Swiss-Prot record:
Monomer. This is Mitochondrial adenyl nucleotide antiporter SLC25A24-A. Pfam families: EF-hand_7, Mito_carr. The regulatory N-terminal domain/NTD formed of two pairs of fused calcium-binding EF-hands, binds calcium in the mitochondrial intermembrane space and regulates the antiporter activity of the transmembrane domain/TMD. In absence of calcium, the apo form of the N-terminal domain is intrinsically disordered and binds to the transmembrane domain, inhibiting the transporter activity. Binding of calcium leads to a major conformational change and abolishes the interaction with the transmembrane domain and the inhibition of the transporter activity. The lineage of its organism: Eukaryota, Metazoa, Chordata, Craniata, Vertebrata. Ca(2+) 2 binds at residues 68, 70, 72, 74, 79.
Length: 473
């Protein structure tokens, strides 16, 4: 069916007037399943799906809303034809703006240059994948007919929106804050779309962290106390409930949620500054430079909010009634240990950024490119499940590499609050853990940490998508 539709749409490429009307009429006839002379959202969804035409989420609703001039919830043939005529005009403008050398075809270099002007740098291989998703004759170039038919039912009407159709950014919050920040185009920065994405991501992170807080607190307890009294996940959760009731499972979560906003803002600002510093004269920012800029941005953000990390750990390992809240905890730490206590464990925390961010980025790019090279037959869009899968696997591998440093950081943050515990530095703690608990002692608490990855990713994605709709992204 798709092949027939493509042949039909690609035929008579230069046709205007009545020929265009005939083309629209035949397409309308295919979509009007119940033959009532109108096409509604459901018929659009089913018809486009049957034709194999991939459109963005909610595209059918946007098409009907844009073309439905009499607001009856349907498109009659006149409305359908006018919508496609207007949409094709906008698509022609977008095509012309991409076709820099005016040869009537879009090439890989033109895709790369256009994305570059919007603040996105991609490889030649990625540009070719984008073209292949539209190229029906195998020439690795896209002419007007191929361009028009690919975006025929995509409601994007300018080059910036089409670029966003190609650009995929997924916000995943698994409770760790060492990932490299998202990229935003210059257009997104100018129009204010960036802060909406950050807000949506922040809300997703807050809900995700709250939903998985019991497992996060159990991880901290196991990191600090070893497996004593917490030999497995169920036993550990029961011990926490027995000590402080069900509410104690969320102890320390408030700080964990509150720190999302300042950390995200600082990381975004710092990343933009470091990118300017590392961008070459040609304006290109390679993968290595992006990794360095992202790692430095993460270190800057962590430095600014690190006292809140210490508060989170102290509240999580604290006993019932020990602290009345975040400010009481901060006050008691200051009085007893001084201001430097708020930066205990800072060095292993910063050192953990390099393996986490590096492995996370490297594995994500490897998995994404593997999919593009082996499975991207009809589209350069991997889809939600593939992107979520790549993000989950890469983040998990990053955690695995940096976990020993995270464990040492947590113990250094908490050791002053444990009576009789020696105040060891990073090296001393490492030797003590290996000598007493063996090599695998460096991975104490990793089971609940891994257990919360899947629900955390799922919750953050669902909330992020809902927030995008609410914010009109």
């Amino acid at each position: 069916m798709l092949e027939q539709v493509q042949k039909f749409l690609l035929s008579r490429a230069a046709c205007e007037g009545s020929d265009s009307h005939t083309r629209y009429a035949e397409l309308f006839h295919k979509l009007d399943v119940n033959k009532d002379g109108k096409v509604d959202i459901l018929e659009l969804q089913e018809g486009l799906k049957a034709m194999g035409m991939a459109v963005g989420k909610g595209a059918e609703e946007k098409i009907v809303e844009a073309g439905d001039t009499n607001k009856d919830g349907h498109l009659d043939f006149g409305e359908f034809m006018r919508y496609l005529e207007e949409h094709e005009k906008k698509m022609k403008i977008a095509f012309t703006s991409l076709d820099k050398n005016k040869d009537g075809k879009i090439e890989s270099s033109e895709v790369m240059n256009s994305l570059k002007t919007l603040g996105i740098n991609i490889s030649l291989d990625h540009a070719e994948k984008i073209l292949k998703s539209m190229d029906s004759d195998g020439t690795l170039t896209v002419d007007w007919n191929e361009w028009r038919d690919h975006f025929l039912f995509n409601p994007a009407d300018n080059i910036q929106q089409i670029i966003r159709f190609w650009k995929h950014s997924t916000v995943l919050d698994i409770g760790d804050s060492l990932t490299i920040p998202d990229e935003f185009t210059e257009e997104e920065k100018k129009t204010g779309q960036w802060w909406k994405h950050l807000l949506a991501g922040g809300m997703a992170g807050a809900v995700s962290r709250t939903g998985t807080a019991p497992l996060d607190r159990l991880k901290v307890m196991m990191q600090v106390h070893g497996t004593k009294g917490n030999s497995n996940i169920i036993t550990g959760l029961k011990q926490m409930v027995k000590e402080g009731g069900v509410r104690s499972l969320w102890r320390g979560n408030g700080v964990n949620v509150i720190k999302i906003a300042p950390e995200t803002a600082m990381k975004f600002w710092a990343y933009e500054q470091y990118k300017k510093l590392f961008t070459s004269e040609s304006g290109k920012l390679g993968t290595a430079e992006r990794f360095i800029a992202g790692s430095l941005a993460g270190a800057t953000a962590q430095t600014s909010i690190y006292p809140m990390e210490v508060l989170k750990t102290r509240l999580a390992v604290g006993k019932t009634g020990q602290y009345s809240g975040m400010f009481d905890c901060a006050k008691k730490i200051m009085q007893k240990e001084g201001i430097l206590a708020f930066y205990k464990g800072y060095i292993p925390n910063i050192l953990g950024i390099i393996p986490y961010a590096g492995i996370d980025l490297a594995i994500y790019e490897t998995l994404k490119n593997y999919w593009l090279q082996n499975y991207a037959k009809d589209s350069a869009n991997p889809g939600v499940l593939v992107l979520l899968g790549c993000g989950t696997v890469s983040s998990t591998c990053g955690q695995l590499a940096s976990y020993p440093l995270a464990l040492i950081r947590t113990r250094m943050q908490a050791q002053a609050s444990i009576e009789g515990a020696p105040q060891l530095n990073m090296g001393g703690l490492f030797r003590k853990i290996v000598a007493k608990e063996g090599f695998f002692g460096l991975y104490t608490g990793i089971a609940p940490n891994f257990l919360k990855v899947l629900p955390a990713v799922s919750i953050s994605y669902v909330v992020y998508e809902k927030m995008k709709i609410q914010l009109g992204i």
